Amino acid sequence: MKVAASSLRKGSVVDMDGKLYVVLSAENIHPGKGTPVTQLNMRRISDGVKVSERYRTTEQVERAFVDDRNHTFLYSDGDGYHFMNPESYDQLVATEDVIGDAAPYLQEGMTVILSTHNDVPIAIDLPRTVVLEIVDTEPSVKGQTASSSYKPAVLSNGVKTTVPPYITAGTKVVILTEDGSYVERAKD
């Protein structure tokens, strides 16, 4: 489907020369003299190469049809990460390139939004937070309650984060998936 270049936003998927690109940033530039242009910074989905393109705002760009659906994470193996559509029970395998930084936060049975193009996974959207267990952290020292200093900790998925001094190993905590930061102690 052709759309005006000026209508593209971050996250849009564009088909250029038979290859898919995801828009990382889109900026409409209106110079004092001349034609307004749209500057697109994109990443090629197949190999991760970043490209920058400039279009007149009225130019038409081929927008790829992307299907965003809920999928349940099943497991990962040498082939990739396996997901199931809970409505049709169809299974899809996403590669490590598609999953990227989301890999440590995937848990069996977790519902994620998987973006596909022609039934090939191209992007994943995790839930905003996950509950993980602290496996290792320094013991808290008495009398440190006045300061708001955080201490390093290792989560059950191997990711390092910082937690308040009263959190001990074995405690379940809520973690933001976008940056791995501590939110709160998990409620049982």
Curated annotation (Swiss-Prot):
Pathway(s) this gene product operates in, as recorded in its UniProt entry: Protein biosynthesis; polypeptide chain elongation
Source taxon at top rank: Bacteria
InterPro entries per UniProt: Elong-fact-P_C (IPR015365), NA-bd_OB-fold (IPR012340), Rib_uL2_dom2 (IPR014722), Transl_elong_fac_P/YeiP (IPR020599), Transl_elong_KOW-like (IPR013185), Transl_elong_P/YeiP_cen (IPR001059), Transl_elong_P/YeiP_CS (IPR013852), Transl_elongation_fac_P (IPR011768)
GO cellular component, one term: cytoplasm
This protein's name: Elongation factor P
Phylogenetic placement of the source organism: Bacteria, Pseudomonadati, Pseudomonadota, Alphaproteobacteria, Caulobacterales
Compartments (UniProt record): Cytoplasm
Principal subcellular localization: cytoplasm
Alphabetically ordered keywords of this record: Cytoplasm, Elongation factor, Protein biosynthesis
Family the entry assigns: Belongs to the elongation factor P family.
GO molecular function terms noted in the UniProt entry: translation elongation factor activity
Pfam family membership, one: EFP_N
Its biological purpose: Involved in peptide bond synthesis. Stimulates efficient translation and peptide-bond synthesis on native or reconstituted 70S ribosomes in vitro. Probably functions indirectly by altering the affinity of the ribosome for aminoacyl-tRNA, thus increasing their reactivity as acceptors for peptidyl transferase.
GO biological process: peptide biosynthetic process
Organism: Caulobacter vibrioides (strain NA1000 / CB15N) (Caulobacter crescentus)
